[in-house]
Amino acid sequence: TVFAKNVLGDVLLTAALTENLTITLYDIDASRLEDSFILIERLNQKYNCGKARVEKFLGVENRKKALRGANFVVNAIQVGLYDPCTIIDFEIPKKYGLRQTIADTLGIGGIMRALRTIPVMADFARDMEEVCPDALFLNYTNPMAMLSGYMQRYTGVKTVGLCHSVQVCSEGLLKGLGMEDKLEGRKELIAGINHMGWLLDIRDKHGVDLYPEIKSRVQAKIDDPKFLDKVRLQYIQHFGYYCTESSEHNAEYNPYYIKTRYPERLKAYQVPLDEYPRRCVEQIEGWKKE
């Protein structure tokens, strides 16, 4: 529902996409489907004067009906949910000394996610090849690279992977470094593999390269005990560019940071082990209140 809100909210705010728009929601969970339906219908009324047609389909037996004739299919699922599967992804490796922060992209957690999600993706692909063979599959589900790679290599479905980290990358960097005055009118270039893109160029509204000033502020933030985004700032020092994905993700991508024999690195870079389960609990509680 969170991804549905973000992606479809953007669609409803883009005039070129709203003409003759039909949004079809599909889920195997009745209560989650109803939550998504209520949310999207409210966004449709608020931002689009109710012009879009919003439909909903429940259950595997209705999946082909939901997909039939689609031009775009947005995939945002979590097979096995937080409880039990995400908990298991963390607790079993931890038992054997393998620690993780997010565990949704690679490593033990990412592999387990892929193994339980690929069969569902294969079902989606078979149905799409039958009822909407020309549709573009927009994958928001992790592990991004593994799942998108599977769809591209082993199915006939046109697939693109998406992640919201690209949209929030430069804003988070500039705010973190105290450069809020450079936000308005900035232009940027981001490229790279999904879930590990790079901010290759960023300029202010006058076309001035912001990287020299960014680099001049990095060390002070790394030395600041209250600042948390330290892994990515170290990347700037070593590689010259800022990475789109969080420091928590990058601490897993690079084998340097999480080492049982070197716990001081966790402290130095403030790497939060078991971060994703904590986020899940907070998000679930926050969503209930919302």
Set out the residue ranges of the language-model regions:
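Conserved N-terminal glycine/acidic-rich loop preference
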Residues: 2, 32-42, 52, 147-162
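N-terminal Rossmann-fold NAD(P) dinucleotide-binding loop
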Residues: 3-8
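Glycine-rich phosphate-binding loop and adjoining beta1-alpha1-beta2 segment
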Residues: 13-51
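Catalytic or ion-translocation cores adjacent to nucleophile or general acid/base/metal-coordination motifs
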Residues: 16, 158-178, 186-189
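A structured beta-alpha segment of the ubiquitous adenosine-cofactor-binding alpha/beta core
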Residues: 44-71, 78-81, 100-106, 114, ...
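Short, solvent-exposed beta-strand-terminating loops
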Residues: 72-94
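Rossmann-like NAD(P)(H) cofactor-binding subdomain of soluble oxidoreductases
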Residues: 95-153, 158-164, 170
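Long, compositionally biased stretches enriched for glycine and/or charged residues
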Residues: 178-290
